[in-house]
Amino acid sequence: MQTEKKEILATAVGRRKEAVAQVQLLRGTGEFIINNKSANIYLNNNSCSLLALKAPFNVLQNLEILTESNQIDTIVKVQGGGLIGQAEAIKLGVARALCQIEVSGSETTDLIRKSFKDQGYLTIDARVKERRKYGLKKARKASQYHKR
């Protein structure tokens, strides 16, 4: 895997919970590599996560912007969080990077962005873990209350 020889089309960052994904889109053969491993191997063949990662590319194929002739390699470096949080961070990063790709015509770029917005791929899920409060066992879990 030599990323320096391939043309970098776009870069973006996606975040979810504690996971941070740095995404690079390169002109290539359509490979999806996460932390120097194939996406299938990295996500333990979890079909739901794999479908979520490929969904932004499917939107582009439905709009007939991305064809087999101009395939895109996706190189991802992801840290922190669990597998599902990482998968959602990667999905957001891929969608952001695909919005940055130069396509012929400004209407096409607006169309890509609008379709991603409608599908919810550019929406950030801002929910994070609630902090633990003193006097409690967890964020909201308290010891059992005794009246007498």
From Swiss-Prot:
Signal peptide: none annotated. GO terms for molecular function: RNA binding; structural constituent of ribosome. Keywords: Chloroplast, Plastid, Ribonucleoprotein, Ribosomal protein. PROSITE patterns: RIBOSOMAL_S9. One of its GO terms (biological process) is translation. The keyword Chloroplast applies. InterPro entries: Ribosomal_Su5_D2-typ_SF (IPR020568), Ribosomal_uS9 (IPR000754), Ribosomal_uS9_bac/plastid (IPR023035), Ribosomal_uS9_CS (IPR020574), Ribsml_uS5_D2-typ_fold_subgr (IPR014721). SUPFAM superfamilies: Ribosomal protein S5 domain 2-like (SSF54211). Pfam families: Ribosomal_S9. GO terms for cellular component: chloroplast; small ribosomal subunit. It is found in: Plastid, Chloroplast. The keyword NAD does not apply. Belongs to the universal ribosomal protein uS9 family. This is Small ribosomal subunit protein uS9c.
